[in-house]
Structures are given as C-alpha cells and as structure tokens.
From Swiss-Prot:
Pfam families: DUF1764. Residues 35-49 have a biased composition (Polar residues). GO terms for cellular component: cytosol; nucleus. Residues 18-28 have a biased composition (Basic and acidic residues). Residues 1-64 are annotated as: Disordered. This is Uncharacterized protein C6G9.01c.
Length: 95
C-alpha cells in the first residue's frame, strides 16, 4: 500500500465535512430563535489588605532602564558602622 493511498482518503474526508458544515450553518440562524449567550466571568478584585503589602510594591524591586536592581540605603547599610579602624573594607561591623 502506498503512502499516497493512505492520505488520499484523509484528504477526501475534510472536503465532505466542510460541505456538511456549510449546510448546517445555513440552517442554524433562524428568525425569532433565541441565542444563548455565555455569561461573562466577573473580574477578580484585589482583596489584599494594605497593611500587609510590601512597601516596595507587588512587582518586587525597582529596576533601572538597563535592568539593574535598585537598592535603598537601608539595604546597603549606608551610614551604619564605620567605627573601627578596619572600615570600610576589612571590618566586620557593616555586615
């Protein structure tokens, strides 16, 4: 059996189905017939409490135009420590 013979029957079937579908579509729209419309889903609302939200926003972190993360002074410990002679590079107070 040839491959073309197998697929020839497959090609003939969609042509028959299309002609049957077009006939049924022509009969479907009748005057005075009520059409059912599916009810739309209600839009979800944000029920999150503002007291428990992250102050930096829901998206996580701010980013620069290049895509780098933006850190604030508290995260970098700027202004904290610096009381030892090893500061700012060899100290253990800033960690």
């Amino acid at each position: 059996m040839e491959i073309d013979d197998i697929f020839a029957s497959k090609k003939a079937n969609p042509a028959n189905e299309k002609s049957n579908d077009s006939k049924s579509e022509a009969k479907a729209p009748k005057k005075g017939a009520k059409t059912k419309s599916t009810p739309s889903r209600p839009k979800p609302t944000n029920n999150q409490d503002d007291l428990f939200l992250d102050p930096k926003g829901a998206s996580g972190r701010k980013r620069t135009e290049e895509g780098f993360l933006v850190y604030d002074e508290e995260e970098l410990n700027i202004g904290q420590g610096g009381g030892t002679p090893d500061c700012p590079f060899d100290c253990q107070c800033c960690f």
